[in-house]
UniProtKB/Swiss-Prot annotation:
Compartment annotation: Cell membrane
Keyword Membrane listed: yes
One family name in Pfam for this protein: TerC
Protein name: Tellurium resistance protein TerC
Homology family: Belongs to the TerC family.
């Protein structure tokens, strides 16, 4: 782990905020209408977010040097790769709630806003905990390694469909709001007046919600879906934040790397959804990277305890992350996933 200290210089923070907020407004303006996002559009927007991140990396290179820029790019690439598995979970959630493609971008937006907030909290806590000593790094190493082991053991469970009605987030929303059973545009909540208007429609004559027992607000399936996505991402952050902190203890580097990676996830989601069957080996790449990060954390912790002198530079970490990602993509091309019908026949 590299502990390059840059603090929180006003100029760097200003550029970070201006780039990220400006790009968010551009994205929101261009996607203000509820319509499906094509693969071409998603790919172009994914490139846009990578360019924004690399622009910030260029700023760091000019103002703070190659080492800091390398740490940022390593953290950014690592968060992108680790997020792939999380995006596949999001696909399963949207599918289970039967959310149409035209509403998924809006649902992802609110899910990612929550991710940005919680990542900030976890980064502050994580970097603060590491200041307590090397034994905290060992704990982080065990957490990351355990995640890799569980992913390895659960590799064959991809076809199992989870019942998200038993999810904690689902049950929490249901405790505070009655549930309107149908989507109502991109609305997350409906007022009693809106529910009455829905109940007046012939196709809703069999719906009993809101007829006898009235309420101020009703949660829609889109609200339930976003709540499940949000809590699932929080659980994912428990694994990803220690992994990114393994790259650097500098909060600004860690958070900015995660922030720019997360902001591009909405459009990356649609790219992965279209190319999912062609990226079948990426999960294995994620597992390899988690073991690498656990090793890096453990190596750094034992160096602090026993002073053996071994460590991995930021450049080496960057090469490993990019190399494993490239191998994962190459393996997916060489060993593509068999279609379901072919799997059943064999």
């Amino acid at each position: 782990m590299v502990s390059t200290h840059i603090g929180g210089p006003a100029e760097t923070v200003t550029v970070f905020v201006a780039l990220s907020v400006g790009a968010i407004f551009i994205d929101l303006f261009m996607h203000r209408h509820d319509k499906p996002i094509s693969l071409k559009s998603a790919a172009l927007w994914s490139v846009f977010w990578v360019v924004v991140a690399m622009a910030f990396a260029g700023f760091l290179y000019v103002h703070h040097g190659a080492e800091v820029a390398s740490l940022f790019v390593t953290g950014y690439a690592l968060e992108k790769v680790l997020s792939v598995d999380n995006l596949f979970v999001m696909m399963a959630i949207f599918s289970w709630f039967s959310v149409p493609d035209r509403y998924r971008h809006r649902g992802l937006y609110w899910g990612i806003i929550g991710a940005i907030v919680f990542r900030g909290i976890f980064v502050a806590i994580g970097t603060g905990l590491l200041s307590l000593g090397p034994y905290v790094e060992l704990i982080f190493a065990v957490v990351v390694a355990w995640t890799a082991v569980m992913m390895l053991k659960g590799g064959g469970d991809d076809d199992e469909i989870e019942d998200y009605s038993q999810h904690l987030a689902y049950r929490l929303v249901k405790r505070f709001f009655p549930i309107w059973p149908k989507l109502s545009g991109h609305a997350f909540l409906l007022t009693q007046k809106e529910v009455d208007a829905e109940l007046a429609k012939p196709e809703n004559k069999d719906v009993s919600v809101g007829r006898l027992k009235k309420a101020a607000l009703y949660a829609t399936p889109l609200m339930l879906c976003v709540a499940v996505v949000e809590l699932s991402d929080v659980m994912f952050a428990f694994d990803s934040v220690p992994a990114i902190i393994a790259v650097s203890r500098e909060p600004l580097i860690v958070y900015s790397a995660m922030m720019f990676a997360i902001l591009g996830l909405r459009t990356l989601y649609f790219v992965l959804e279209a190319l999912k069957q062609y990226l079948s080996q990426l999960e294995k790449a994620v597992i390899v990277l988690l073991f690498f990060i656990a090793f890096k954390l453990g190596l750094n912790a034992t160096d602090h305890i026993w002073h053996h002198g071994y460590s991995l530079s930021a450049t080496t970490s960057l090469y490993v992350v990019l190399g494993v990602l490239a191998l994962g993509i190459l393996a997916s091309v060489i060993f593509p996933e068999k279609p379901e019908a072919e799997n059943k026949e064999s």
